[in-house]
Curated annotation (Swiss-Prot):
Name of the molecule in the record: Replication-associated protein
Catalytic activity, EC: 2.7.7.-, 3.1.21.-
Organism of provenance: Tobacco yellow dwarf virus (strain Australia) (TYDV)
Presence of the UniProt keyword Protein biosynthesis in the record: no
Chain positions of motif RCR-2: 61-63
Sequence motif: RCR-1, positions: 19-22
Binding site for a divalent metal cation: 53, 61, 63, 105
A cellular component term, taken from the record's GO annotations: host cell nucleus
Length: 337
């Protein structure tokens, strides 16, 4: 019995190579060959092969490979229907494989001259591949995409930034201290923390050292002192793990309210190997295992915004220092800023 036409509202066939299957077809292979050759003459058909295969119940179905010189643009799903027989329609991605498949039983008729065909990567793929292989930096990569694919650049920049960061991982900038050790001073409690926990011999694996919390007035040199102690990750305003230096010996959290610090227990508790979710990026594991120096002013005192349980954890993992009146981190002879 003839099969019903495909029901689709958006059918479109654009290809030079077509593979059709007519299940339980009532038409002969010869009639189908002549019908399709005439029907596809406007697309400069140059080869057709039709194979007859019998079902177990004895009814035939026909396989058909078509090769065109001009690219088809067919929107009517009933275009290939013959005598009430409607085929399954799909592009032939590899004409040689399709011809081999339909010829397995040997019952094949052909017309025209067969040409080997295999779908090659699209021009778009080739252009993307060239960009990926030739760009030497994130900036050059994005500039090349902007020139070649302006629509993608305008509408998918967030994802392109992500792929750029995968190809060219951001390298952390090493902070260069603007003040020398002689220009700075610190309270003896802070000096003790620095010397015992930061300037120390490599500690035994699995041990954790306390973080440091400094709360006090603005423009007293807290940030300058904290950033002068060695290689570190620095966050101001927000915590962003996009660029994280695994070789840093400590982190600085500067003027960020407690409620905006994600994974604060992992950070303050000097925990190792925890997972973060960077902005515009996928989750990744952070090496961690280094203490934090938390800096804030009196109006953003973290302890005022913590529950009793949070305070208990915080004080067990962090040394707190509230600056006294007139305390400064600048040595008397240095100029403050």
């Amino acid at each position: 019995m003839p099969s019903a036409p495909q029901k689709t509202k958006s059918f479109r066939l654009q290809t030079k190579y077509v593979f059709l299957t007519y299940p339980r077809c009532s038409s002969s292979a010869e009639n189908l060959r002549d019908f399709l050759w005439d029907k596809l003459s406007r697309f400069a058909i140059f080869f057709i092969a039709i194979a007859t295969e019998l079902h177990q119940d004895g009814t035939p179905h026909l396989h058909c490979l078509i090769q065109l010189d001009k690219r088809s643009n067919i929107r009517d799903p009933s275009f290939f229907d013959l005598e009430g027989n409607h085929p399954n329609i799909q592009p032939a991605k590899n004409s040689e494989q399709v011809l081999e498949y339909i010829s397995k039983d040997g019952n094949v008729i052909t017309k025209g001259e067969f040409k080997k065909h295999r779908v090659s990567p699209s021009k778009s793929d080739e252009r993307w591949r060239t960009i990926i292989q030739t760009a030497t930096s994130k900036e050059e990569y994005l500039d090349m995409i902007k020139d070649e694919f302006p629509h993608e650049w305008a509408t998918k920049l967030q994802w392109l930034e992500y792929s750029a960061n995968k190809l060219f991982p951001p390298q952390p900038e090493i902070y260069q201290a603007t003040f020398t050790e002689e220009d700075l001073q610190c309270h003896e409690d802070l000096q003790l923390w620095r010397d015992q926990h930061l300037y120390h011999e490599p500690r035994r694996a699995g041990t954790r050292i306390p973080s440091l919390y400094i709360c006090g007035p603005s423009r007293t040199g807290k940030t300058t002192w904290a950033r002068s102690l060695g290689r570190h990750n620095y966050w101001n305003g927000t915590i962003d793990f996009t660029v994280y230096d695994d070789h840093a010996t400590y982190n600085v959290i500067d003027d960020i309210p407690f409620k905006f610090v994600p994974l604060w227990k992992q950070l303050i508790g000097c925990q190792s190997d925890f997972t973060v979710n960077p902005k515009y990026g996928k989750k990744k594991k952070i090496k961690g295992g280094v203490p934090c120096i938390i800096l804030c002013n009196d109006d953003e005192d973290w302890l005022k915004n913590m529950s009793p349980a949070q305070i208990e954890y915080f004080e067990a993992n962090c040394i707190t220092h509230f600056m006294y009146a007139a305390e400064t981190f600048f040595a008397p002879e240095s100029s403050s800023h």
